[in-house]
A protein has these predicted regions:
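Residue-level detector of functionally special positions within alpha-helical transmembrane segments
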Residues: 1, 66-68, 130, 135
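Residue-level marker of structural boundaries
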Residues: 5, 61, 99-103
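Active-site environment of divalent metal-dependent phosphoester hydrolases
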Residues: 2-9
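C-terminal subdomain of the subtilisin-like protease fold in secreted/lumenal serine endopeptidases
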Residues: 20-23, 32-35, 83-162
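A short beta-strand-to-loop transition that corresponds to the Sensor-1 phosphate-sensing loop
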Residues: 1-2, 27
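Extracellular S/T/G-rich loop segment that most often corresponds to the catalytic His/Ser-adjacent loop
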Residues: 13-83, 87
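Short beta-strand elements of extracellular/lumenal beta-sandwich folds
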Residues: 168-176
Length: 176
């Protein structure tokens, strides 16, 4: 966490920054980063941490923000994986959560691909919101369907009515 500082800041926070700890940053449920959570290249993963409904002692429920809400989201996915794969090591479970996380958050938050430090200078190659947003469906489903991402591809319509739009019955060349 960032100690309830309303301004997010570039900082290694302990104990989250220790090598043997999975560090989780809080983001919105849609994947957008609200500007108040800690960001740093030591962050391993992002998880929903805005407007999370939680119990309040003696008062029912309330919505909360922060890594205290995001971390249980990430931990629950690891627990779910443990129930599917009881013989896996902790390292295997963590690797699955990281490799199945969704990096679309960097499309929504492009300024955080290269972490801006507290002075606004980019730290090149430092993905400061981690590997992506935790994704329970992908973490469990990776064994049931291929997980293939094509980042660089192009296709060209080579047959059809000449409108350069792929329509039923048209042919195309796909380059990967």
């Amino acid at each position: 966490g960032n100690g309830d500082d309303p301004q997010g800041y570039y900082s290694e926070e302990y104990p989250a920054a220790y090598d043997n700890v999975l560090s989780v940053s809080a983001i919105g449920c849609s994947g957008s980063w609200g500007g108040w959570a800690t960001y740093h290249e030591s962050v391993d993963l992002a998880a929903p941490g805005e407007n999370i409904l939680s119990a309040v002692i003696g008062e029912g429920y309330d919505s909360w923000d922060g890594s205290s809400m995001a971390s249980p989201n990430a931990a629950s996915v690891i627990g779910l994986l443990r129930s599917y794969y009881p013989d896996w090591s902790n390292d295997q479970l963590i690797e699955r959560v990281l490799s199945s996380s969704d990096d679309f958050i960097y499309d929504l938050n492009p300024d955080y691909v290269d972490c801006p430090d507290n002075s606004g200078n980019p730290v090149v190659g430092g993905y400061c919101l981690g590997a992506g947003m935790v994704d329970a469906y992908k973490a469990i489903g990776m064994d049931f369907s291929p997980n293939i991402k094509f980042k660089n591809y192009s296709f060209e319509v080579v047959g059809g009515d000449g409108d350069n739009v792929l329509n039923p019955g048209d042919s195309f060349d796909l380059s990967l």
